[in-house]
Amino acid sequence: MNKEQFKGKWNQFKGEVKQQYGKLTDDDLKEVEGDYDKFQGKVQERYGDEKQAVEDWAENWHKNNT
């Protein structure tokens, strides 16, 4: 998923990411606001070693929602 695709699907994505990964707060999601680089940073901050699993989930979500 590229940055433009991420931004375009942000409103759909943020609700599902919040359900799947509850460590990402509403404030985190407001800060990210469709920016894939910021999303990756927040995932790293909140999930550390699980970063790749979260990114894989995001990629799979995108494939299933395009």
Regions found by a protein language model. Name each.
Residues M1-T66:
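Intrinsically disordered, low-complexity, hydrophilic segments
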